[in-house]
């Protein structure tokens, strides 16, 4: 089975999520699958750039490359999990915390953006739509 592991990439930053994705790909390959990481660069500031990156992620079609189907996509990080694939499931490592727990605690940088509340609502709506559309 050809599997794409979806995550965002912040250039020059590497941490636990990146190691998790690499280890997941390695394990899938060890079990006989053909797996690879599919990364999308992500910048979340200022707010209009965040909205652009959400749209850009949604516009990606990951169902095939070079005419060869990708059988499954595993979404790990926002907004990469918004990319289109008909057989997508989610192993959520990173939601956009500024729209969730950091917002609730008052620590979200998004709160200081003039469009912060609208962006938070957009993120919630995009996540709900993506998760609802998943066949899993």
Residue ranges and their predicted role:
Residues 13-14, 44-47, 80-84, 97-100:
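Short catalytic/ligand-binding loop motif for oxyanion handling, primarily in non-cytosolic enzymes
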Residues 71, 86, 135-136:
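Conserved acidic residues
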Residues 74, 83-118:
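Active-site proximal beta-strand in glycosyltransferases
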Residues 109, 113-136:
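Membrane-proximal helix-turn-helix segments that form the acceptor-binding/catalytic region
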